[in-house]
UniProtKB/Swiss-Prot annotation:
Database matches in HAMAP family: Pantothen_kinase_3
Protein name from the UniProt record: Type III pantothenate kinase
Gene responsible for this protein: coaX
Name of a matching Pfam family: Pan_kinase
Positions with a binding annotation for ATP: E7, Q8, G9, N10, T11, N12, T13, M14, T133
Reactions this protein catalyses: (R)-pantothenate + ATP = (R)-4'-phosphopantothenate + ADP + H(+)
Active site, UniProt feature: D110 (proton acceptor)
Cofactor binding description: A monovalent cation. Ammonium or potassium.
Binding site for substrate: G108, A109, D110, R111, T187
Pathways involved: Cofactor biosynthesis; coenzyme A biosynthesis; CoA from (R)-pantothenate: step 1/5
Keyword terms: ATP-binding, Coenzyme A biosynthesis, Cytoplasm, Kinase, Metal-binding, Nucleotide-binding, Potassium, Transferase
Length: 261
């Protein structure tokens, strides 16, 4: 088995190859909703070649996307170039997770995949924090069920909004303030401090409120594109896990394969 897992967020799209035993390659590209199957394959073919793989090596594809207008092109990529009918989260893939919220159809594909990936490794109940375009806090019960969560603006979105809405504030890179200083001494350091420590306080405050509301100890896992930025800056996060989403996709693929056999 050679599985191509595609995880598409609003900002980045990840392509990962699993050979049945381990992940052998991972690549990221900027998410562009208008990118065609032909454009994807030109880019992907070069990367596959660097790994010594050809199109014929791929015999399974699973897709998770939060960008509806991109799914057609990703599905077309799978059908035309790999001759594979893909599993698509939210369409033909059976997730095998109990979704205990008022409107289960509104649960984002990425959030459910993360919940499955987390429940495979960590004993629940869990808080799964995904730091991307949005920062989400999702609750996974002790039995693995998805029980809702919180959606907040992402750190990059907040920094972008500062720059675009305030004429004198520059566009800057997001990074941890030098020397862990709280108070900035110029515009750039003040912005970095506000966004970085503001998000640390967001994480610490919401995790504390979630635990208080539920009245039980919970394990907190962080994943996502900028999660590593917070490592060592707070005691509210127990584990940083960059493989959470692709682990969930692999498990969903296996569940569907078993169901079909």
């Amino acid at each position: 088995m050679m599985l191509l897992a595609i995880e598409q967020g609003n900002t980045n799209t990840m392509f990962a190859i699993h050979d049945g035993a381990s992940w052998v390659a991972q690549w990221r590209s900027a998410t562009e909703s208008t990118r065609t199957a032909d454009e994807y394959v030109v880019w992907l073919s070069q990367l596959l070649s660097m790994q010594g793989l050809g199109f014929r090596a791929i015999d399974a594809v699973i897709i998770s996307s939060v960008v509806p207008q991109s799914i057609f092109n990703l599905r077309n990529l799978s059908r035309r170039y790999f001759n594979v009918e893909p599993l698509v989260i939210g369409e033909n893939a059976k997730l095998g997770i109990d979704v205990r919220i008022e409107k289960p159809s509104e649960a984002g594909a990425d959030r459910l995949v993360n919940a499955i990936g987390a429940a495979m490794v960590y004993p629940g109940p869990l808080v799964v924090i995904d730091s991307g375009t949005a920062t989400t806090f999702d609750i996974v019960a002790a039995d693995g069920a998805f029980e809702g969560g919180i959606i907040a603006p992402g750190i990059n979105l907040s920094m972008q909004a500062l720059h675009e809405a305030a004429a004198k504030l520059p566009r800057i890179a997001i990074q941890r303030p030098a020397g862990n200083r709280i108070v900035g001494t110029d515009t750039v350091s003040a912005m970095q401090s506000g966004v970085f420590w503001g998000y640390i306080s967001l994480i610490e405050g919401l995790v504390a409120r979630i635990k208080a509301e539920r009245g039980e100890p919970m394990t907190v896992i962080a994943t996502g594109g900028v999660a590593s930025l917070f490592e060592g800056a707070t005691d509210s996060i127990d584990h940083f896990d960059s493989d959470l989403t692709i682990r969930g996709l692999l498990e969903i693929y296996r569940r569907n394969t078993i169901a079909e056999s």
